[in-house]
């Protein structure tokens, strides 16, 4: 980027992989500087995680954003997400397809949230990553990918 110092933490949006915005318009997201702040790393490291497939993002309103649901309440990436993304990328899925699958309610997926006995049916796979069904989502991804 002209005028930027080598090693600058500001990455060009066009050079960062991101899928089409297939998310609900009300789905909360973080921009890359906020993700960097949460993770305690430079924005360039977040861009690297996106390029390496450890995170996925969408293009929204001229920028690149990452869904808030990919992070825990303490600001860390949900434990099973990077491995799940690797499985799906290795299976040939692109970021847009991955986002669509993660955020589409699945009538066969029922989750129970930590601290609750109430089952939520027709859950989204991304929500199951925060529940006891994370392994089930990974298993389903493996079956889809191979």
Curated annotation (Swiss-Prot):
Region (Disordered): 1-27
Keywords associated with the record: DNA-binding, Phosphoprotein
Post-translational modification: Phosphorylated by PknL. Phosphorylation negatively regulates DNA-binding activity.
Source organism, top-level taxon: Bacteria
Phenotype when changing residue 9 to A: Lack of phosphorylation. Retains DNA-binding activity
Residues recorded with modification Phosphothreonine: 9
GO MF terms held by the record: DNA binding
Comment, domains: Contains an unusual winged helix-turn-helix (wHTH) DNA-binding motif missing the typical third helix.
Binding partners and assembly: Monomer in solution. May form homodimers. Interacts with phosphorylated PknL.
Function: Binds DNA at low salt concentrations.
Protein name: DNA-binding protein Rv2175c
